[in-house]
């Protein structure tokens, strides 16, 4: 499977935003990201990409 869990990095700590994400789409308006998981749930997050760990299946936002 190619899903990843998305975390928000604040003050050096990672907080889970959504599990099983398979769509990660930056919005045209800077600073927002649309996430969709394997269950069809969507979330619009006010954050930007920090980094991606393919080995750990993690997407880190800031």
Put a short name on every predicted segment:
Residues 2-10, 15-62:
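Compact, glycine-rich, soluble single-domain proteins
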